[in-house]
Amino acid sequence: MPTDLAPLGRGDRKVVMRKPLMIARQGRRPAGLLGELVARVMARQTAAENDIVLELLQLDPADCVLEVGSGHGDTLAKAAGVASRGSLSGIDFSSVMHRRASRRHRGLVREGRVGFHFGNSDRLPYADRAFDKAYAVHTVYFWAAPLEHLTEIHRVLRPDGRFVLAFRAAEDTRFRATHPSEIYCIRPEGEIADLVRRAGFDVVDTLRRTVGAKLMSFVVAGRPS
């Protein structure tokens, strides 16, 4: 387990400001005109960690892929470039993000390559064992009962399928200090990995990478055959 994290120093604590609740709520579930703006910002701010997730997924051309919390849809569109013979689905419980992704990638939608769905990941609208690969980025903070969501992802993944969960953990002290606990439930990395195991996955690896000013954690897991 990596231990390369440093706590905030005294100087850091003086300048850290907590994200306003209104903005934090938009980060969880973008809505209205402000949500449209947040969607644009999020697309830029999360691109690097999404690229890392695609690398960790080890996509094959015929893979069927699920993104939980598909947001702007840009990552799923990139995945479609690799999984060129597969089908790809994204689900998001923000109507703003669902509309934005559907419009932004309407070409892929029209071709039947990608489908964006409006809904919640604790009740996924997909058949058992429908996907070869699945991933979720910056979603776990917003799951009131994370085991329910993870169990659903396990249900729709095929045996020997691969799942990658990306998040900022409680060990990232700056993230914890600046994001209100009323909206963000920020758990330790080890606790998240244990939840993934309890959902039925085998945890293959846990990684940490510095992405700009963010310290990202990645849990790589597989569904046993």
What are these regions (language model features)?
Residues 44-63:
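Conserved alpha-helix/loop element of class I SAM-dependent methyltransferases that forms part
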Residues 62, 157-162:
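Short glycine-dipeptide loop
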Residues 64-123:
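Class I SAM-dependent methyltransferase SAM/SAH-binding core
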Residues 122-133:
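A short acidic, Gly/Pro-enriched loop at the edge of an enzyme's catalytic core
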Residues 133-146:
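A short SAM/SAH-binding and catalytic strip from SAM-dependent methyltransferases
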Residues 147-159:
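A short glycine-rich, Lys/Arg-flanked "PGG" loop and its adjoining helix->strand segment in the class I
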Residues 162-191:
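Conserved class I S-adenosyl-L-methionine
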Residues 199-200, 208-225:
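Core SAM-dependent methyltransferase catalytic element
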